Design a protein with these regions (language model features):
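Ligand-binding cleft/hinge of the Venus flytrap
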Residues: 5-14, 94-117, 148
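Periplasmic-binding protein-like
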Residues: 59-66, 148-184
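Alpha-to-beta junction loops
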Residues: 13-15, 31-40, 84-85, 129-138, ...
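Short, hydrophobic alpha-helical packing/hinge segments within bilobed ligand-binding/sensory domains
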Residues: 4-5, 26-29, 123-127, 133, ...
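Short helix-initiation/N-cap motifs at beta->coil->alpha
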Residues: 17-28, 73, 112-126, 163
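Extended ligand-binding regions for polar small-molecule ligands
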Residues: 2-11, 70-72, 79-80, 84-85, ...
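Acidic, polar ligand-binding/catalytic clefts
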Residues: 6, 10, 15-79
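A ligand-binding cleft/hinge motif common to bilobed small-molecule-binding domains
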Residues: 42-49, 97-104, 127-161
Length: 192
Protein backbone atom coordinates (compact mmCIF):
# COMPACT_ATOMS: atom_id res chain seq x y z
CA UNK A 1 0.00 0.00 0.00
CA UNK A 2 2.83 2.52 0.59
CA UNK A 3 3.93 1.90 -3.01
CA UNK A 4 0.42 2.73 -4.27
CA UNK A 5 0.42 5.86 -2.09
CA UNK A 6 3.74 6.98 -3.60
CA UNK A 7 2.48 6.39 -7.14
CA UNK A 8 -0.73 8.31 -6.43
CA UNK A 9 1.07 11.25 -4.84
CA UNK A 10 3.45 11.44 -7.78
CA UNK A 11 0.64 11.21 -10.31
CA UNK A 12 -1.35 13.95 -8.57
CA UNK A 13 1.68 16.18 -7.95
CA UNK A 14 1.24 16.00 -4.18
CA UNK A 15 3.73 15.67 -1.35
CA UNK A 16 3.20 12.35 0.41
CA UNK A 17 3.12 12.03 4.18
CA UNK A 18 2.82 8.39 5.23
CA UNK A 19 1.21 7.95 8.65
CA UNK A 20 1.51 4.42 10.05
CA UNK A 21 -1.77 3.33 11.61
CA UNK A 22 -3.30 0.23 13.12
CA UNK A 23 -6.13 -1.42 11.19
CA UNK A 24 -8.61 -0.49 13.90
CA UNK A 25 -7.76 3.21 13.65
CA UNK A 26 -8.31 4.00 9.96
CA UNK A 27 -12.11 4.58 10.09
CA UNK A 28 -11.88 7.22 12.82
CA UNK A 29 -8.79 8.73 11.19
CA UNK A 30 -10.71 9.27 7.94
CA UNK A 31 -13.97 10.50 9.48
CA UNK A 32 -12.15 12.90 11.83
CA UNK A 33 -10.01 14.31 9.02
CA UNK A 34 -6.74 13.13 10.54
CA UNK A 35 -6.00 11.30 7.27
CA UNK A 36 -7.06 12.36 3.80
CA UNK A 37 -6.72 8.86 2.38
CA UNK A 38 -6.41 5.42 3.95
CA UNK A 39 -4.59 2.60 2.18
CA UNK A 40 -4.46 -0.38 4.54
CA UNK A 41 -5.85 -3.25 2.45
CA UNK A 42 -9.40 -1.92 2.82
CA UNK A 43 -12.00 -4.00 1.01
CA UNK A 44 -15.09 -2.27 -0.33
CA UNK A 45 -18.24 -3.48 1.45
CA UNK A 46 -21.83 -2.26 1.37
CA UNK A 47 -21.57 -1.24 5.02
CA UNK A 48 -18.42 0.81 4.38
CA UNK A 49 -19.94 2.45 1.26
CA UNK A 50 -22.43 4.19 3.57
CA UNK A 51 -19.60 6.02 5.34
CA UNK A 52 -16.69 6.29 2.89
CA UNK A 53 -15.83 6.79 -0.79
CA UNK A 54 -13.55 4.33 -2.59
CA UNK A 55 -11.18 4.29 -5.56
CA UNK A 56 -10.41 0.64 -6.29
CA UNK A 57 -6.98 -0.60 -7.29
CA UNK A 58 -6.99 -4.39 -7.05
CA UNK A 59 -9.04 -7.52 -6.50
CA UNK A 60 -8.50 -9.14 -3.12
CA UNK A 61 -8.62 -12.88 -2.62
CA UNK A 62 -8.54 -14.37 0.85
CA UNK A 63 -6.70 -17.51 1.91
CA UNK A 64 -6.46 -19.97 4.76
CA UNK A 65 -2.93 -20.83 5.83
CA UNK A 66 -1.60 -23.22 8.44
CA UNK A 67 1.72 -24.37 9.85
CA UNK A 68 3.54 -26.37 7.16
CA UNK A 69 3.43 -29.49 9.36
CA UNK A 70 -0.28 -29.14 10.16
CA UNK A 71 -2.65 -32.05 9.62
CA UNK A 72 -5.13 -29.60 8.07
CA UNK A 73 -4.92 -30.35 4.35
CA UNK A 74 -7.79 -28.25 3.04
CA UNK A 75 -10.26 -25.56 4.04
CA UNK A 76 -13.17 -25.17 1.65
CA UNK A 77 -16.14 -24.56 3.89
CA UNK A 78 -17.50 -24.13 7.42
CA UNK A 79 -17.11 -27.78 8.47
CA UNK A 80 -13.34 -27.61 7.87
CA UNK A 81 -13.00 -24.93 10.56
CA UNK A 82 -15.34 -26.46 13.16
CA UNK A 83 -13.61 -26.34 16.53
CA UNK A 84 -10.45 -24.73 15.12
CA UNK A 85 -8.75 -21.60 16.43
CA UNK A 86 -8.71 -19.13 13.52
CA UNK A 87 -6.76 -15.86 13.41
CA UNK A 88 -8.78 -13.01 11.90
CA UNK A 89 -8.65 -9.24 12.14
CA UNK A 90 -11.46 -7.46 13.95
CA UNK A 91 -13.81 -5.65 11.58
CA UNK A 92 -12.47 -7.39 8.46
CA UNK A 93 -14.22 -9.30 5.70
CA UNK A 94 -12.46 -12.38 7.04
CA UNK A 95 -14.14 -11.94 10.41
CA UNK A 96 -17.54 -11.49 8.77
CA UNK A 97 -17.07 -14.68 6.72
CA UNK A 98 -15.82 -16.66 9.73
CA UNK A 99 -18.75 -15.55 11.91
CA UNK A 100 -21.16 -16.51 9.12
CA UNK A 101 -19.51 -19.92 8.85
CA UNK A 102 -19.76 -20.27 12.64
CA UNK A 103 -23.53 -19.74 12.39
CA UNK A 104 -23.69 -22.45 9.71
CA UNK A 105 -21.63 -24.81 11.87
CA UNK A 106 -23.85 -24.25 14.89
CA UNK A 107 -27.02 -24.74 12.80
CA UNK A 108 -25.56 -28.05 11.60
CA UNK A 109 -24.73 -29.14 15.15
CA UNK A 110 -20.98 -28.61 14.73
CA UNK A 111 -18.68 -26.67 17.00
CA UNK A 112 -17.98 -23.10 15.85
CA UNK A 113 -14.44 -21.96 15.14
CA UNK A 114 -12.85 -19.82 17.83
CA UNK A 115 -11.85 -16.43 16.41
CA UNK A 116 -8.40 -15.32 17.57
CA UNK A 117 -8.06 -11.55 17.31
CA UNK A 118 -4.53 -10.21 16.91
CA UNK A 119 -3.38 -6.77 15.86
CA UNK A 120 0.02 -7.54 14.35
CA UNK A 121 1.46 -10.00 11.88
CA UNK A 122 4.36 -11.11 14.10
CA UNK A 123 1.93 -12.36 16.75
CA UNK A 124 0.00 -14.26 14.09
CA UNK A 125 3.16 -16.01 12.94
CA UNK A 126 4.03 -16.88 16.53
CA UNK A 127 0.53 -18.20 17.27
CA UNK A 128 0.56 -20.45 14.19
CA UNK A 129 4.06 -21.79 14.81
CA UNK A 130 3.46 -22.42 18.53
CA UNK A 131 0.07 -24.10 18.03
CA UNK A 132 -1.88 -21.39 19.86
CA UNK A 133 -3.91 -21.02 16.65
CA UNK A 134 -4.66 -23.56 13.93
CA UNK A 135 -5.45 -21.38 10.92
CA UNK A 136 -4.70 -17.86 9.71
CA UNK A 137 -7.44 -16.34 7.52
CA UNK A 138 -6.21 -13.29 5.64
CA UNK A 139 -5.16 -11.83 2.29
CA UNK A 140 -4.09 -14.47 -0.22
CA UNK A 141 -1.12 -12.43 -1.44
CA UNK A 142 0.31 -12.24 2.08
CA UNK A 143 -0.33 -15.94 2.75
CA UNK A 144 1.38 -17.02 -0.48
CA UNK A 145 4.33 -14.70 0.14
CA UNK A 146 4.86 -15.99 3.69
CA UNK A 147 4.66 -19.61 2.55
CA UNK A 148 7.21 -19.02 -0.22
CA UNK A 149 9.50 -16.90 1.95
CA UNK A 150 9.92 -19.15 4.97
CA UNK A 151 8.34 -22.49 4.15
CA UNK A 152 6.91 -22.50 7.68
CA UNK A 153 3.32 -22.15 6.49
CA UNK A 154 1.22 -23.46 3.63
CA UNK A 155 -1.94 -22.23 1.95
CA UNK A 156 -4.75 -24.79 2.30
CA UNK A 157 -7.69 -22.97 0.79
CA UNK A 158 -9.14 -19.78 -0.62
CA UNK A 159 -11.91 -17.69 0.86
CA UNK A 160 -15.40 -17.95 -0.62
CA UNK A 161 -15.52 -14.42 -2.03
CA UNK A 162 -13.34 -11.87 -3.74
CA UNK A 163 -13.50 -8.20 -2.91
CA UNK A 164 -12.12 -4.98 -4.31
CA UNK A 165 -9.41 -3.21 -2.34
CA UNK A 166 -9.50 0.56 -2.52
CA UNK A 167 -8.11 3.85 -1.41
CA UNK A 168 -10.59 5.18 1.11
CA UNK A 169 -11.66 8.79 1.70
CA UNK A 170 -14.26 10.65 3.68
CA UNK A 171 -17.67 10.38 2.02
CA UNK A 172 -18.56 13.28 -0.22
CA UNK A 173 -15.27 15.21 -0.15
CA UNK A 174 -14.67 14.64 -3.89
CA UNK A 175 -11.10 13.36 -3.51
CA UNK A 176 -12.15 9.92 -4.71
CA UNK A 177 -12.57 11.19 -8.29
CA UNK A 178 -8.99 12.42 -8.52
CA UNK A 179 -7.72 9.21 -6.93
CA UNK A 180 -9.65 6.98 -9.34
CA UNK A 181 -8.47 9.02 -12.33
CA UNK A 182 -4.87 8.74 -11.09
CA UNK A 183 -5.23 4.98 -10.56
CA UNK A 184 -6.73 4.56 -14.02
CA UNK A 185 -3.83 6.55 -15.48
CA UNK A 186 -1.30 4.41 -13.62
CA UNK A 187 -2.95 1.30 -15.04
CA UNK A 188 -2.82 2.71 -18.58
CA UNK A 189 0.85 3.67 -18.41
CA UNK A 190 1.84 0.39 -16.74
CA UNK A 191 3.06 1.92 -13.47
CA UNK A 192 0.52 -0.03 -11.43
Amino acid sequence: DPDIARLLAGSLGLKLKLVPTAWEDWPLGITSGRYDVALVNIAVTEQRKAKFDFATYRVDSLAFSVKSTSDIASVSGPADLAGKKVIVGSGTNQERILLGWNAENEAAGRQPALPVYLTDDASGNLYIQSGRADVFFGPQSVAAYKAALSGKTKVVGLGPKKAYVATTTRKGNGLVYALQAALDGLDLDGSH
